[in-house]
């Protein structure tokens, strides 16, 4: 009677093991599902078998205008759709010549055909009747730009040299113009050529310092006279205290019996600025180049 009792224990032990295995498999599947879901969010692809690959159509995310707003493509598309930017691009590329209507890009054209206006985010402004700036802009008539002719663009101004040109942007070099009364160094020119010792811009001396220019009246400028002592204001002498030979006959012409001693004594002190005074009065002095000099003998009554 004691033998059948041990036979009842193994079925209870096997039932507990079955429940335990089911619970373990359930937990493993749940953990695997959570891992695949997390990896999908990070961008990984999870496949149930090695041969099955997902279709490309399933991999592509649904197109949504609200997603990826800060990407480069979105920024470029917004720039192209702007009318002012499209006009600037057309001018830089040089596609439009003369008068023409600014055409929008292909992306803007297709979107305008579908919705009647390009896709954009609606803006709300307080205190304005218009609900959106972009919507009110699309209601305006097409912008017509009156282009300038090529002759006006390519016609250079006097003194300009084009260095670099791209579209409507040009880099030009303008030569500096100087006035009529200025040198290149910025100093004014001296137009008073009649001043004493002045030089004209041609390099020649003026009438006061040398030869006068042809076709102009000769103007003489008198140099300032130096103050002379009373001892030197006598008859001009040259050649070491002797009188000029041209003055001897005139000095002794009136009184042939007079002696030339006072003249020699007064003139022996040195040369006087008599010739310079003659030049100042317009009469050039004649220097005695001959070796013959008239010297009256001492003690003689006359020559």
UniProtKB/Swiss-Prot annotation:
UniProt KW keywords: Cell membrane, Membrane, Phosphoprotein, Transmembrane, Transmembrane helix
CC per GO annotation: plasma membrane
Membrane-spanning segments: 15-35
InterPro entries: RELL2, TNF_rcpt_RELT
Chain segments carrying region Disordered: 46-67, 111-303
Keyword Transmembrane recorded: yes
Basic and acidic residues composition bias: residue spans: 148-158, 172-188
Chain positions with Phosphoserine modification: 52
Primary localization class, coarse: membrane
Membrane topology category: Single-pass membrane protein
Compositionally skewed regions (Gly residues) per UniProt: 194-212
Localization in the cell: Cell membrane
Biological role: Induces activation of MAPK14/p38 cascade, when overexpressed. Induces apoptosis, when overexpressed.
Xref: PANTHER family: RELT-LIKE PROTEIN 2 (PTHR31481:SF0), RELT-LIKE PROTEIN 2 RELL2 (PTHR31481)
Family: Belongs to the RELT family.
Name of protein: RELT-like protein 2
Organism: Bos taurus
């Amino acid at each position: 009677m004691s033998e059948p009792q041990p036979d009842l224990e193994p079925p209870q032990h096997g039932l507990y093991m079955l429940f335990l295995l089911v619970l373990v498999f359930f937990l493993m599947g749940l953990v695997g599902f959570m891992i695949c879901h997390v990896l999908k969010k990070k961008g990984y692809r999870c496949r149930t078998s090695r041969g099955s690959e997902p279709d490309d159509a399933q991999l592509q995310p649904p197109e949504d205008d609200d997603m990826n707003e800060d990407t480069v493509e979105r920024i470029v598309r917004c720039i192209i759709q702007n009318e002012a930017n499209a006009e600037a691009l057309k001018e830089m590329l040089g596609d439009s010549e003369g008068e023409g209507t600014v055409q929008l890009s292909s992306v803007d054209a297709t979107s305008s055909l579908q919705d009647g206006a390009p896709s954009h985010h609606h803006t709300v402004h307080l205190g304005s009747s218009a609900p959106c700036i972009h919507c009110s802009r699309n209601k305006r008539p097409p912008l017509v730009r009156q282009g300038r002719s090529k002759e006006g663009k390519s016609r250079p101004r006097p003194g300009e040299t084009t260095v670099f040109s791209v579209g409507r942007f040009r880099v030009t070099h303008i030569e500096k113009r100087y006035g009529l009364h200025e040198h290149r160094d910025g100093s004014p020119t001296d137009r008073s050529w009649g001043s004493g010792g002045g030089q004209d811009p041609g390099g020649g001396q003026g009438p006061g310092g040398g030869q006068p220019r042809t076709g102009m009246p000769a103007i003489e400028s008198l140099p300032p006279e130096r103050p002379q002592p009373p001892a030197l204001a006598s008859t001009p002498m040259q050649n070491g205290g002797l009188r000029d030979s041209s003055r001897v006959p005139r000095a002794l012409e009136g009184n042939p019996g007079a002696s030339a001693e006072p003249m020699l004594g007064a003139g022996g002190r040195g040369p006087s600025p008599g010739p310079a005074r003659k030049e100042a009065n317009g009469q050039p002095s004649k220097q005695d180049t001959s070796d013959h000099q008239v010297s009256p003998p001492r003690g003689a009554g006359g020559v």
